[in-house]
């Protein structure tokens, strides 16, 4: 299905589906909610970590489980699977570099209402200046019966802005723009007025602007078709985002311009591939379990209850293996499994070509990229490359390779962490992109379909291919 020239209808449809997903997923909480809805629409059943699964899961069916509502694991059990057989896994993450409201966010200066924010992850922070910014996250509301319920909120309009200083007051701005993250990187949300002063006096909230709490309460009230009092908001986790929608760009719509490509791009492709792989009753002859974990907190190290270094994935795989009676079967399943760490990759930047290794440089719309690093910043090895090349050949999609220069630092992914924790064979890959960790990034519009088809082929062919690549007998 290799594509040449302009996009095919199916490639464009896949790219447009991604736009819908990323525009509806301003936070990990929204992403997980949308993933759950996608899985349920394809017959997946929800499982609670707090319940016993022994009587609930069985071969031939599909399930998903969430943790903290910001990480999710979906899996489909082949009808021929038995404890001791392997898992085919494509792991992604749901978070992106962003700005998060501080526990006490209320600020004001010279008649402006401001909010205090804390940086999350390694963003290119200067790209957040002079952008229309929205606000989204989860809000904890106390109900009349005393329960505290999470509501996802998205103020889907330009609400905040971090303005730059006029060049007349900073003549060096074009040659050496720099700023203090604490004092010169404070978003504006409005102007002080009599209404704001009155609400502050009535509410007495010293943590957040009362007008902000009222805005959140109104947003929740609209979704519930009832009235929520701002005083019932107990706490929240809110982050800023680019208010401009993701969209197609370029002369032939060959680009996608979007926030959060890293890593909702791969999260979208993996989830689509899992459900696509189930077509034509493919689980009937499947001897493995197909798994897509999407973790929170990758951008800050993955060390949390819902991050990739948590018990989440090992616990889920262990519970699936407990369908058998022998405790040793879990360890056997691990060594028979293969994990693909799917995280976006660096495409060639035409204005900075000297920063790239000449022979292993990916390009947009040329296929998914296998990432290699001798120092195990990426976990790819020759056995994994052989497997992915065969998977790509069966799917008739192109793949590329990426290696950093010897005089350049190298990023990493959840791949090495999961490989070390589980002992599973692991490979790192991702679709190529530009402006990684910017407030707004870009990638190729054809590469979404390439990745979905590649990942679906991996799920459908892993069991047969795994037996033919002999390493440890």
UniProtKB/Swiss-Prot annotation:
Tetrahedron-shaped homododecamer built from six homodimers. Interacts with autophagy receptor Nbr1. NCBIfam families: PRK02813.1. Its cofactor is Zn(2+). This is Aspartyl aminopeptidase 1. Pfam families: Peptidase_M18 (PF02127). It is an enzyme of class 3 (hydrolase). Belongs to the peptidase M18 family. Keywords: Aminopeptidase, Chaperone, Cytoplasm, Hydrolase, Metal-binding, Metalloprotease, Protease, Vacuole, Zinc. Transmembrane segments: none annotated. Zn(2+) 1 binds at residues 93, 262, 298-299, 343. One of its GO terms (biological process) is protein folding. GO terms for cellular component: cytoplasm; cytosol; fungal-type vacuole; fungal-type vacuole lumen. Its EC number is 3.4.11.21. Aspartyl aminopeptidase that is able to remove aspartyl residue at N-terminus of angiotensin I. Also acts as a chaperone and efficiently suppressed the thermal aggregation of citrate synthase. Substrate binds at residues 168, 298, 343, 346, 371, 378. GO terms for molecular function: aminopeptidase activity; metalloaminopeptidase activity; metallopeptidase activity; zinc ion binding. It is found in: Cytoplasm; Vacuole lumen. Binds 2 Zn(2+) ions per subunit.
């Amino acid at each position: 299905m290799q594509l040449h020239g302009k996009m095919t209808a199916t490639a464009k449809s896949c790219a447009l589906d991604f736009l819908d997903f990323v525009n509806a997923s301003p936070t990990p909480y929204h992403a997980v909610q949308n993933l759950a809805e996608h899985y349920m629409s394809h017959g997946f059943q929800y499982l609670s970590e707090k319940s016993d699964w022994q009587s609930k899961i069985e071969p031939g069916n599909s399930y998903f489980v969430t943790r903290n509502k910001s990480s999710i694991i979906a899996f489909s059990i082949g009808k021929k699977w038995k404890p001791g057989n392997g898992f085919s896994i494509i792991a992604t993450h749901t978070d992106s570099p962003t700005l998060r409201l501080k526990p006490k966010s209320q600020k004001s200066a010279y008649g402006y209402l401001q909010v205090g924010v804390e940086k999350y992850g390694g963003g290119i922070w200067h790209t957040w200046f002079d952008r229309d910014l929205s606000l989204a996250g989860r809000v904890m509301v106390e109900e009349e019966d005393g329960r505290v319920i999470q509501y996802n909120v998205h103020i889907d309009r330009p609400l905040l802005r971090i303005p730059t200083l006029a060049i007349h007051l900073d003549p060096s701005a074009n040659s050496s723009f720099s700023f203090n993250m604490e004092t010169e990187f404070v978003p504006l949300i409005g102007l002080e007025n009599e209404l704001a002063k009155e609400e502050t006096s009535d509410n007495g909230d010293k943590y957040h602007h009362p007008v902000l709490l009222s805005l959140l309460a109104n947003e929740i009230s609209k979704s519930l078709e009832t009235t929520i009092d701002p005083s019932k908001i107990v706490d929240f986790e809110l982050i800023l985002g680019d208010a401009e929608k993701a969209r197609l760009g370029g002369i032939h719509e060959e680009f996608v311009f979007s926030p959060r490509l890293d890593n909702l791009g791969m999260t979208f492709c993996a989830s689509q591939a899992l459900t696509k792989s189930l077509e034509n009753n493919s689980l009937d002859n499947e001897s493995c379990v197909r798994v897509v974990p999407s973790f929170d907190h990758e951008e800050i190290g993955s060390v949390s209850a819902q991050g990739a270094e948590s018990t989440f994935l090992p616990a889920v795989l262990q519970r699936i293996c407990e369908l058998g009676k022998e405790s040793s079967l879990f360890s056997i399943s691990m060594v028979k499994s293969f994990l693909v760490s799917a995280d976006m990759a660096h495409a060639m930047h035409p204005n900075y070509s000297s920063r790239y290794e000449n022979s292993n440089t990916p390009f947009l719309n040329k296929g998914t990229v296998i990432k290699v690093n001798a120092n195990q910043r990426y976990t790819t090895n020759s056995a994994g490359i052989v497997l992915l090349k065969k998977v790509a050949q069966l799917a008739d999609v192109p793949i590329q390779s990426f290696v950093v220069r010897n005089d350049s630092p190298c990023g990493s992914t959840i791949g090495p962490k999961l490989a070390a924790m589980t002992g599973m064979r692991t490979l790192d890959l991702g679709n190529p992109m530009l402006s990684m960790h910017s407030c707004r990034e870009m990638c190729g519009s054809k590469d979404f379909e390439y990745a979905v088809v590649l990942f679906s082929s991996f799920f459908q062919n892993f069991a047969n291919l795994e037996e033919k690549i002999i390493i440890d007998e």
